[in-house]
Amino acid sequence: MINEVKSDAQSRMDKSVEAFRSQLSKIRTGRAHPSLLDGIMVPYYGSNTPLRQVGNVSTEDARTLTVTVFDASLIKAVEKAIMGSSLGLNPMSAGTVIRIPLPPLTEERRRDLIKIVRGEAENSRIAIRNIRRDANNDLKLLEKDKDISEDEQRVGEELVQKTTNDHIKQIEDLLVVKEAELLEV
């Protein structure tokens, strides 16, 4: 039973780390990366569709992304969606290809992005701690119902704490790497 509680907590913590990793990929660094445009939705036949479903996003060079739109009638809508995003990008179309030059990040913008990244990291740490709390409560309930002994409860809590520490360390490692990327000129 302890292993079930621990494995449930572990899988939920893994999802929190993965969600943090996904959030980081959407925050712009100095380099062009196709995942930068993942959050952009394009109006297509009356519903919002992810950009990746209406075109192919690729990297042309270190500072330029290209979007090859599958349907030429969507070029204006894709450009408008990219301009309307909070990324501060100005797309230029050439036929069915849209080029998106990435302006260099200013020092002030880098500092703002680092604050955002740190906030996301803190939210992920809080989520992981909440999962730990839930797992410890489950262990206490098992002990209260006499399904496990007090010693087994303590051992279970130690296992959950170790898992929590491992996942918070993963968050910290991802944070350090992203901050270094943002500060790189």
Curated annotation (Swiss-Prot):
It is found in: Cytoplasm. GO terms for cellular component: cytosol. GO terms for biological process: cytoplasmic translational termination. The keyword Kinase does not apply. Transmembrane segments: none annotated. Pfam families: RRF (PF01765). GO terms for molecular function: ribosomal large subunit binding. It comes from the Bacteria. Keywords: Cytoplasm, Protein biosynthesis. The keyword RNA-binding does not apply. Belongs to the RRF family. PANTHER family: MITOCHONDRIAL RIBOSOME RECYCLING FACTOR PSEUDO 1 (PTHR20982:SF3), RIBOSOME RECYCLING FACTOR (PTHR20982). Responsible for the release of ribosomes from messenger RNA at the termination of protein biosynthesis. May increase the efficiency of translation by recycling ribosomes from one round of translation to another. This is Ribosome-recycling factor. It comes from Psychromonas ingrahamii (strain DSM 17664 / CCUG 51855 / 37).
